[in-house]
A protein has these predicted regions:
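Carboxylate-rich, polar loop motifs that coordinate divalent cations or form catalytic acidic clusters
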Residues: 1-249
Length: 249
């Protein structure tokens, strides 16, 4: 009887091992499937995107993805790209293929900064927004960032003419008044939850415009930093990405 019992045990063990093996294979297949699902898809100039040099990715209030490139504007609906380029025979189109930055205003219109102007997309028509310097003279300048502020204004960051503002219903863009008017070469800005404006100059120096307009030029702990980017989390903490000192909190 003992040999028979041993055979039953061996068969039982084989069934158990087979079951475990099948279970492990099933888990492996699920894991592999999840890994495949998480794998990114590359879009470049050989695959739908108009240029390999992309400067910003922006998602609008309807969920569409807008991509600024050095060869036109790309719009992605989750399935396909639509590319908009400068049309020399179309006065209502892009006036440049050199798109630097994107945001959306209070009315839901897309706002673009190019290498020489500020544009607003009204339906299918691009409108050029006149940019006026501190003497109210028209200028053409390199727009490096567009950002919607808490009051609905669009802050327009330029290289050479400082920070400008475009009010929702205004037909032009004007130099931001106050102490910040003396700042000309701006790299990046961030308006925090307290409505203070953090300003990174092109040389990496960090400044802050208080809500009352006062400009703070010495921010403790940042004097020696070469700041490249700035972000704020949901708790209000400010993070600085620096050139040689890592991330500063």
């Amino acid at each position: 009887m003992k040999p028979r019992i041993m055979m039953i045990s061996m068969k039982s063990n084989l069934r158990t091992m087979r079951y475990i093996g099948l279970l492990l294979m099933f888990i492996f297949c699920l894991t592999a499937q999840n890994m495949m699902a998480q794998r990114g898809k590359l879009f470049n100039s050989d695959n739908q995107l108009s240029s390999n040099l992309a400067t910003q990715v922006f998602q609008d209030s309807n969920g569409f993805i807008w991509i600024a490139t050095r060869n036109g504007l790309n719009i992605y609906d989750g399935y396909n790209f639509m590319v908009i380029r400068k049309a020399y025979n179309n006065s209502n189109g892009l006036n440049s293929n050199y798109i630097n930055c994107i945001t959306q205003d209070e009315k839901g219109r897309i706002v673009l900064g190019t290498n020489k102007s500020l544009l607003i997309l009204n339906g299918k028509r691009f409108s050029n927004v006149p940019m006026l310097d501190s003497r109210n003279k028209p200028i053409n300048t390199y727009v490096t960032q567009v950002s919607r502020l808490h009051n609905g204004d669009i802050a327009v960051v330029t290289s050479g003419y400082g920070i400008m503002t475009k009010k929702t219903d205004a037909n032009a863009c004007y130099t931001m008044k106050g102490e910040v008017e003396n700042l000309k070469y701006i790299h990046k800005i961030l308006e925090d939850k307290q409505e203070r404006l953090w300003i990174i100059l092109e040389n990496g120096k960090l400044l802050r415009k208080e809500k009352n307009g006062k400009l703070v030029s010495r921010i403790m702990g940042t004097e020696q930093l070469n700041t490249q980017d700035i972000r704020q989390d949901d708790k209000g903490n400010i993070y600085l990405a620096t050139k040689n000192e890592g991330v500063y909190l």
